[in-house]
């Protein structure tokens, strides 16, 4: 139902996470304040929101145990201080078995954690940038889809590489999602070819808003991320977009906060015009 619901003021952040949380927070906290100052009620952070480690050993040193994160506490306090919801695109936590999880967290305006989602699809790929990515060597995959209320809209929580698996998003939409949070740290090579196409496709085929906060720049491990934080309408139109990294920009030059007002009525309108969610046959 959309009757009587007002548009939601959403911001998506773009920046280049450092190799440690402490250094990243010096960039991130002012961006959160900037988004709140500009009127955002929901602020979305990218994948690897607090750090992108230079090595597996550095990941082990920097990641905190789940449930004992002082860095997460600081972000929760920021949400409460500004009276905003935070979609923390992902943080890396240490599990008791020694493995890590890549976890997307939704924090309410009271600073409490409302929902959490562990990344299901591991990025094991070679995208032609001279690096080999094997997330399955570092992280334990999740196994549950997650939706949650965010500012009166139903949000589907996902992370980065999940974007390439459309069945996940159709299921989230059919179960009630109106907004899809797709935080990312897309590599430059794959982003240049696929980023816009994939995000707009997910919006069009689900009739959902897509909010994609993203990393942008060259990180401690040498990877270069694409940027272009995006907010996409249920009709597949780009509502807001940040710039990309040209490879030579000064540190912080590509940091950005983009904004859009998400009107729940646009979801109803798109799905009424093209009712594909309700007409797809089941295949055996």
Model region roles, listed by residue range:
Residues 2-10, 147-156, 179:
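Beta-strand-turn-beta hairpins that frame and shape the catalytic cleft
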Residues 14-19:
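Short polar catalytic/cofactor-binding loops
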Residues 21-22, 26-110, 116, 187-208:
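Cys-nucleophile CN-hydrolase/nitrilase-fold catalytic domain and related Cys-dependent amidase chemistry
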Residues 51, 56, 105, 116-123, ...:
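Short beta->alpha transition motifs characteristic of CBS
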Residues 66-87, 154, 160-258:
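CN hydrolase (nitrilase-like) catalytic-core segments centered on the catalytic cysteine
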Residues 88-90, 103-106, 146-148, 229-231, ...:
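Short beta-strand scaffold segments in enzyme catalytic cores
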Residues 95-175, 188-192, 197, 269, ...:
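Active-site catalytic loop in hydrolytic enzyme cores
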Residues 257-284:
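Short, basic/aromatic-enriched C-terminal tail that caps enzymatic domains
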């Amino acid at each position: 139902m959309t009757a009587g619901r007002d548009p939601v003021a959403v911001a998506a952040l773009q920046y280049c996470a450092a190799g440690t949380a402490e250094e990243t927070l010096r960039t991130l906290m002012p961006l959160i304040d900037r988004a709140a100052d500009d009127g955002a009620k929901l602020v979305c952070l990218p994948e690897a929101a607090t750090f992108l480690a230079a090595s597996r050993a550095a990941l082990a040193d920097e990641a905190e145990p789940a449930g004992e994160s002082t860095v997460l506490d600081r972000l929760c306090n920021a949400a409460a201080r500004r009276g905003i919801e935070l979609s923390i695109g992902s943080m890396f936590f240490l599990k008791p078995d020694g493995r890590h999880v890549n976890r997307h967290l939704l924090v309410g305006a009271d600073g409490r954690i409302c929902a959490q989602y562990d990344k299901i699809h591991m990025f094991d790929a070679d995208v032609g940038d001279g690096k080999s990515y094997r997330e399955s060597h570092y992280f334990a995959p999740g196994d549950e889809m997650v939706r949650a209320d965010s500012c009166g809209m139903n949000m589907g929580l996902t992370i980065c590489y999940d974007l390439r698996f459309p069945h996940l998003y159709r299921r989230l939409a059919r179960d009630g999602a109106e907004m899809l949070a797709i935080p990312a740290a897309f590599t430059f090579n794959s982003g240049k070819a696929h980023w816009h196409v994939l995000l707009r496709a997910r919006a069009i085929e689900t009739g959902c808003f897509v909010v994609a906060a993203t990393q942008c720049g060259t990180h401690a491990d040498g990877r270069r991320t694409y940027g272009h934080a995006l907010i996409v309408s249920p009709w597949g139109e780009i509502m807001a977009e940040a710039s990309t990294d040209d490879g030579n920009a000064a540190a912080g030059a590509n940091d950005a906060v983009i904004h859009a007002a998400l009107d729940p009525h646009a979801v109803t309108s798109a799905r009424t015009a093209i009712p594909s969610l309700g007409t797809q046959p089941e295949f055996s």
